[in-house]
A protein has these predicted regions:
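Solvent-exposed amphipathic alpha-helical surface segments
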Residues: 85-92, 145, 220, 224
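A short beta-turn/loop motif at secondary-structure boundaries
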Residues: 105-109, 205-207
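Catalytic core of non-heme Fe(II) oxygenases with the double-stranded beta-helix
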Residues: 109-192
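Residues at beta-strand starts and edge strands
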Residues: 12-16, 111, 134-136, 209-211
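Catalytic core of Fe(II)/2-oxoglutarate
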Residues: 171-264
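Aromatic-acidic/polar surface patches that form glycan- and anion
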Residues: 67, 71, 131, 184, ...
Length: 264
């Protein structure tokens, strides 16, 4: 990665965390969307699939991501993040050698695998963990408690309710910032990182809600994407429109019965 004249960083092993401020209007839309999800009695709980010792964690449906404009934004930011990773040292060439469907000249595509919202309250926490079945993860901070109780040892401030990246090691605090503090300065920021980077969220004491939105993304080659699109096209051609019953009601059924046995 060119950092200046005669200064190039070659660190393909580095776990890059990239932070970007979410556009104000999109942030407002996201806050409203997560409000509605939290209040919906039919919300889809994500708790069974997540590591958090947290009661309120809910999936965000793909159509909601698309309608809100989040899908387009997440794909744009993830693609930009992956481009940054590839320019770091020889990652581009290394991926091309190792994987059959590598970047191949930056010819790749991004897809959002899943997204969920986390509503964390007093004494709840997220233990150290990483994310599987994806390559890139991200978290957007939406809300922090207005005031949390001070720690028992008051000189150790800034950790309660904080997002901690553990994979960076105990580096000099002047060189790295592995702690995303639980305060208003971090609201509205999106942080992207490798899915393998271990992280946790500390508990806090006091009233109020700590809210975030997370998503997992995968990176595939354009060749893979074209293959998926072609496969979906072929599946669509197998679908028959069958006129059943009175009143001309139309039901769509798959010609291949095995499609009905597929996992969701």
């Amino acid at each position: 990665m060119e950092m200046g004249d005669n200064w190039q960083v070659n660190a393909p092993w580095a776990q890059l965390v990239v932070s970007t401020k979410v556009p104000d209007e999109l942030f407002k839309t996201t806050l409203e969307l997560t409000d509605k999800i939290y209040e919906d009695v039919n919300r889809d709980s994500a708790g069974g699939s997540l590591a958090g010792q947290i009661h309120n964690e809910y999936y965000i449906a793909q159509e909601k991501l698309i309608e809100s404009g989040l899908m387009e934004y997440f794909i744009e930011m993830t693609t930009k993040y992956w481009g940054t990773v590839l320019t770091n040292g020889n990652m581009w060439q290394a991926c091309d050698r190792k994987f059959e469907h590598g970047p191949h000249g930056f010819n790749y595509a991004c897809k959002i695998v899943s997204a969920w919202t986390v509503h964390q309250f007093e004494n709840e926490y997220n233990p150290i963990h990483d994310h599987s079945n994806c390559k890139i993860s991200a978290v957007m901070h939406l809300k922090f408690p207005e005031k949390i109780d001070p720690p028992v040892k008051e000189h150790l401030t800034g950790l309660d309710g904080a997002l901690i990246f553990s994979g960076m090691g105990d580096a000099d605090e002047w060189c790295t910032a592995p702690v995303m503090k639980c305060d208003s300065s971090n609201v509205g920021w999106l942080h992207l990182f490798p899915s393998s980077l271990q992280h946790s969220v500390y508990p806090f004491r006091g009233k109020g809600e700590r809210r975030s939105l997370s998503f997992n993304a995968d990176i595939i080659s354009q060749k893979q994407l074209d293959s998926i699109v072609e496969q979906q096209k072929n599946e669509q051609e197998k679908i028959k429109i069958v006129n059943k019953g009175k009143g001309g009601k139309m039901n769509i059924i798959a010609a291949d019965e095995e499609n009905e046995k597929g996992e969701m």
